[in-house]
Amino acid sequence: MTAGAAYRELGESAWSWVMRQVREDDGPWLPVDVSEDEASPVPGKDRDSLYDGIAGLAPVLAEIDLQRSRTDVEQELADRVVRRLLAGAQVRVEPSLFDGLGGDVTALRLLAPGSEAVALGRLADLMTPAGWRTTREFEPGSDAPLTDVIMGTAGVVLAAVWAGGEHAEAIATTGGEALLGAADETDAGLDWGMVPGRQSRGPNYSHGTAGIAGALAVAGAAAHR
């Protein structure tokens, strides 16, 4: 067996295991952890998210499309995921890439191109000059917009520009200006906390300056600046 065939077999085996974990309760869902001791798991609050929910199945299905045709079972799963995410996107208020509408945009664009317009429209409705208010209570009692890629404005900008469509430029412009407004000027250049003024800082991509700088570059290109 060639190395490529071995990797393919491993990937198919892992995917088959994931498929066996898909449950049904008003649409498909996945348990975050699989334990033989937990006889009757229930859907988590983030069941639809890109991070640990059904939206996270979309990149896998898209990768499968590059290698082979979907099976009937895989196609049915994709259709169920799309229906569930479309219904949720119409009322969802969490904006983020990994836990909210940004993830809806990503998954819908991958599984049913064009349907992501619903989630993008919702993001356009929810945007403020400071970005998008969070539901994650990163700081107790506060819904102030976050800045980072995972939970904040940077991730929303990246998702919207990647997906494109009528709302993409407005989201990129508003998000980019919000990020610039949230920046702190230092001797070394601009720097960001996950909320403006927060003492803790990170240089990393997921929650820090590298990711925000990348989102600003993408936003600037989308806005022709």
Regions found by a protein language model. Name each.
Residues W17-R20, E24, E63-L66, A87, ...:
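Positions within ordered alpha-helical repeat solenoids
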Residues M1-Q67, T71-L77, G121-L123, T173-D184:
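Low-complexity, Ser/Thr/Pro/Gly-enriched N-terminal "stalk/linker" regions
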Residues D46-E63, P95-L110, P145-W162, R201-V218:
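Well-ordered alpha-helical segments within folded domains of soluble proteins
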Residues Q21-P43, V82-L97, L126-T147, L180-P203:
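Glycine- and aromatic-rich loop/turn segments at beta-sheet edges
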Residues A3-Y7, D46, R70-E74, V93, ...:
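Residue-level recognition of alpha-helical structural elements
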Residues L108-T174:
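Internal, well-ordered domain-core segments that constitute the primary functional module
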